[in-house]
């Protein structure tokens, strides 16, 4: 799931920078009522505990202005935020993994998908609001 929020002009670009800095300095401890387990900061190469702000582990991989808010112990439910490198916008990505069972009907799968999408929209909208507060 992807949501784009467009900004305009130099002030918009500065606002996006403030949002990212604010989320790094003071990450939300929950999104839509769901506890944030860790925040992965791809720029710093670390994962932090949002309650304490302390680094809990180093993270390997590509460096970039990206924050990942992990909402499940298995790491499969997450919301990611990053500024666009080519357009005046900030991008929010949501991902979730819901368990399925062999033999689920089409209606059951459709219902599960709708439930997952509703959860993702709530998490992403919550992160948008948190970013706006900091921008």
What are the residue ranges of the model-derived segments?
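Phosphate-binding and adjacent anionic-ligand microenvironments
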Residues: 1-82, 93, 100-104, 109-135
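A generic beta-sheet turn/junction motif
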Residues: 85-87
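General beta-strand recognition
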Residues: 89-91
């Amino acid at each position: 799931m992807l949501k784009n929020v467009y900004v305009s002009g130099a002030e918009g670009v500065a606002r996006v920078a403030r949002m990212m800095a604010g989320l790094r300095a003071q990450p939300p401890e929950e999104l839509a009522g769901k506890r944030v387990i860790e925040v992965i900061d791809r720029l710093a190469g670390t994962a932090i505990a949002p309650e304490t702000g302390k680094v809990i582990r180093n993270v390997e991989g590509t460096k970039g202005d990206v924050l990942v808010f992990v909402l499940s112990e298995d790491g499969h439910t997450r919301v990611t935020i990053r500024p666009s490198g080519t357009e005046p916008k900030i991008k929010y990505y949501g991902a979730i993994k819901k368990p399925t069972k062999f033999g689920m009907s089409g209606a059951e799968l459709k219902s599960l998908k709708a439930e997952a999408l509703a959860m993702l929209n709530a998490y992403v909208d919550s992160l948008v609001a948190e970013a706006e507060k900091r921008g």
